[in-house]
C-alpha cells in the first residue's frame, strides 16, 4: 500500500513553494487537535531557530550584528509560538 502524502503550499508576498509530506509523519508529530499546517509550521520554526542559534553561538569567530538581531527576533517569535524559550524547549541553554 502506498504511503499517503499531503501537499502543502508555503506562500510569501511574491513567491510560493509546494512541500509534500507524509501523512503518517504528520500524525506522529501532531498534538491533539493540531492541523497539518500547524505541525509543519512548528517544525519549520524549530528548524529555523536551531539554524540561527547555531550560526550565532556555535560558529567560528564573532557573529555579525545583523545575524544577532535576526536571532533575537527569531527567538522572540519562537517564544510567542510555543510559550517557552528555545532553551526551555530544547534543554540547550547558554
Stretches with model-predicted labels:
Residues 1-94:
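Acidic, polar-rich N-terminal leader regions of halophilic archaeal proteins
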Amino acid at each position: 500500500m502506498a504511503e499517503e502524502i499531503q501537499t502543502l503550499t508555503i506562500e510569501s508576498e511574491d513567491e510560493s513553494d509546494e512541500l509534500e509530506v507524509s501523512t503518517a509523519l504528520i500524525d506522529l508529530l501532531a498534538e491533539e487537535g493540531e492541523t497539518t499546517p500547524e505541525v509543519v509550521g512548528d517544525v519549520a520554526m524549530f528548524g529555523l531557530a536551531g539554524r540561527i542559534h547555531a550560526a550565532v553561538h556555535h560558529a567560528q569567530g564573532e557573529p555579525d550584528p545583523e545575524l544577532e538581531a535576526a536571532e533575537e527576533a527569531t527567538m522572540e517569535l519562537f517564544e510567542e509560538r510555543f510559550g517557552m524559550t528555545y532553551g526551555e524547549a530544547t534543554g540547550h541553554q547558554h
